[in-house]
Each structure stands twice: as structure tokens, then as C-alpha cells.
Amino acid sequence: MMMKFKMKKSVLATALLAATSIPALTAHAGATINFGEDKSISLGFGMRSSFSSVEDGAPNGTSRSQDFSLNSARIYISGSLNKNIKGMLNTEKDIAGEGFQVIDGNVQIQIIPELTIWAGRFLSPSDRANMAGPYYSLGGGYWSGIASRYGFNGGYIGRDDGVAAVGELLDGKLGYSLGAFEGNTAFKIAGLTNQGPLTGSDGLMYAGRLQYDFWDAEPGYYGTGNYLGAKDILAVGIAGRTQNNGAASLTKEGRYSSYSVDFLLEKKDVGPGAVSFEAAYYDYDTDDVFLSEQGKAYSAGAGYIFSEPVGWGKFQPFVRYQKFNSDALTASDIKKYDVGVNYIIEGYNAQVSAIYSDTKVSGTDNKNAFNVALQIQF
């Protein structure tokens, strides 16, 4: 059988787009090999690299740090067996010092247009920020683990092993996802020193999300944090998860549960561009096992993207606020403010960001930081 090789604007266009209805805005540039009708393999690559300067971040504790970092490097592979069976395999260069890992390895089986079964390793249902991740968020950086703690405290960067029912109803306006997962990885990279092995009863983690789009529908399971002026969005989402004995220390085990509510508004043609507002509320409960990871969190952000290009791309200034209130008496509350600007060259495939941040941990002095990041996806 002859294989036809051609370059496409999306590494997921044939193999993954059909399965998950991920909008073209979030797709990668890449290459697709077609084997026949509805049979293909696609390959892509993404990376985020940055320069940062952090107050008192140098080894002497009093000077500013000056560091270049490769924050993320991913290989994207997706495939299509037929019009109803698709799959993906995505990797990350490193997770919490544990080296190269598979973050997504799953198959998607479309039962009917309104229902697709996901099985394997993938993002379990959660808030918009975690479903979008650092590559598809307003300015990136949700992995700071302040408000949206799923990406930071969610196993394989927010992923888990399990199965979920995913789909859209009401002409795509109502999105739903509900699944069962292995769990017990909620604090995999949290840096807790007193985590212990599970010795009590075993139980799965159950997670779900509902989202309603009042204006333009948002197709797809893996989401987008900002549509960069491409859509009119008014959306509200709720998510929750729970697992018996999902929090285990060296001396105690308890139920892990959390829920969140998130909101996104984007409007095109507001003056010379498009405006966006986002907000979210989180409640985390570890059954008093890890009080430092138990509490309430808040986030809010706003952005404005200019329609007229300047040189290669468009400017998008933005602001963001995050706060986590811990229940621990000895732990600290955290607040972070970001002010920045994105230079959008080709959607989420090519952009540069410059961000000034101020972080306040209760009981300590404020720490400011300046970060310039480059994101490229092929």
C-alpha cells in the first residue's frame, strides 16, 4: 500500500482532531503520514524555554539569580486506526527530577458522536487551567502550583491512569467528562516529606467535569485557557474528584477530595482587539492528613489581544492573580501577582512572553521575578 506523506498545519488534524474535536487553534504544526482512509500517524514536538531573574535567588541568598532553563520538551504522537478509534502518545523531558516520562498514552473510542471513551493515561477531569496546561494558557505558568494545584499535585503532570466517558450535548454547548482513575498520585511532585505508602483499603479516584458554553461552543476534552481573539466565549465549568484513602502520610490515611468552579469570558471586536476575563475558585480537602495541601484557592486574570499585527505577530498584555490559603497552622499562605505581555506569532505554536511576578509567602518578604519565555510547537 502506498503511503502518502504531506506536511500539515496540525499534528493532530487527522488523527486526534477527529477523535477529540480539539479546536484547530490548539493544534500543533507537524507531519502526518497517511496509510489510507482514516488511517494515519502524526508526529510533533513542543518546547518551552525561559530566562529568569529572581530576587534573592542566587546561591548567596542576597543577589538576583540569572538562569536559562528548558522548562518543557515534549514529543507528540497521535494515530488513527479508523474513523472511530484514535490514540495519542505524548512525552515530557522530566517530571520532578524523575527523567523522561510518558504523560499521555491512551486510546479514544467514539461510540456515538456525543460519547467517546478514553482509556489509558491522560488528564483526569479538572479545572480549565489544568485541562489547558502551560502550553494553552494566558501567559502559561499555571504549574506554579498556587491556585490550580492539579498540574503540580496531579501525578504525571495532572495525568492519571484510568477510563472516562467524554462528550458534548446540546449542540456542543454542554461538555461533560466522568471517569475512574488509579489515583494515589495526587501529591506525586508536591515535595511533601511525610508521604507514606497506602496500607488501608484500596479504592479508585472518581473525577468529573461539566461545562456550559453560553456563546460559541468549545469542542474537545483537552481545553484552552484563552482563544486569542478567535472566539466569543462565555463559559462556566465545575469539576470535582474524590478518593477514599487518597491521602496517605507515614502515620495517617484519609479521603482526598476537591472541587472547583471556573469562568471564562472572551469578546471579539472590543475596540482594536479582543478582551478576556477569567476566574476560578478551588476547595481542597485531604481529611486533615496534609494540612499544607488542604485549603481554599482563588485565581483571576484579564487580557487584551490587539487585532493589528506588529511585525510577525500580535501583542497581548495581561494580568493575573493567584492565592492559596492553607489550613496548616505552621504552613504559609501564598499570593502571586503577574503582569506581562505575550507576543503571539502563530497562535500557541509560536509565541514569546515577558512577565514580571511578585510572590508573597506569609511570614516572609515579597520576592519579585522577571521571566522571558519562548514557546514553539512543531
Task: Locate each region found by the language model.
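Short, structured loop/turn "capping" segments at alpha-beta junctions
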Residues: 218-221, 273-275
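Glycine-rich loops and low-complexity Gly/Arg-rich segments
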Residues: 69, 112-114, 142-146, 189-192, ...
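Outer-membrane beta-barrel pore domains
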Residues: 4, 32, 36, 61-62, ...
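A short secondary-structure junction signal
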Residues: 177-179, 187-195, 220-221, 248-250
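A short hydrophobic/aromatic micro-motif that marks alpha-helical segments and, especially, helix-coil
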Residues: 23, 98, 186, 361-362
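Outer membrane beta-barrel
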Residues: 30-186, 200-218, 224-229, 294-308, ...
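Interfacial loop-to-helix transition and helix-capping segments at the boundaries
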Residues: 195-201, 254
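Cleavable N-terminal export/targeting peptides
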Residues: 1-32
